[in-house]
């Protein structure tokens, strides 16, 4: 059993509290599917409630740290060196439709470097955690390791599509086609943080998506790296995918191949 640090314990407590609230609300959402209006407003309230619970719990643990959160944005802390990056509900569309594939994502950044990451899927009760230089774990006790597969033809690769209003749909379709040609096991599950956790767990060999937000990827970046995986910016190897939101996560075995295939579509 790995020893859990005090910081990670605070994150786990916050995630478990938010999870209880989200699980209750997810039960309601399943009932609301039949109504004509749908559960849209109800889900945004659920999302905000979860964010508030996480905020309170993290604040109690570390009163001086700042925050970057999906719903309420940036809160400066009195200590400028530390910042929590939080997505209270990643995979919102799944949640809204009663599809049990969504999660909570919490990361800690210290002086601009990711030091702690947690991704929690409470429906499957799978918690993925990592601490910098301390490895990545599932359910707090089993070490995570990226997959050893090296053959694109036998790989499982996940992606996410850009939204019509903000994304380059043509580019996405070119990338999708190019990857599908060499790797038939393509998936699109709709929760970027979980996609990254699954790369870390060796379930997919790779995941790529563009225009994500920092809270979608912060925890996942650290978890993938600590599981022995590679993270890259899709267009500029010097840029930080946490800032640009264009991310490729992969095991070592297919990293250069998938990068080449994606680049060939530019
Ligand atoms: P969300 O559920 O928190 O909105 C789906 O492709 C994944 O992308 C989800 O993790 C979703 O997070 C995230 N996402 C967030 N903003 C997005 C955007 N503007 N366009 C596409 N996907 C976005
Ligand atoms: Ca998200």
Briefly describe each language-model feature range:
Residues 22, 47, 58, 92, ...:
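Residue-level signal for inorganic ion chemistry
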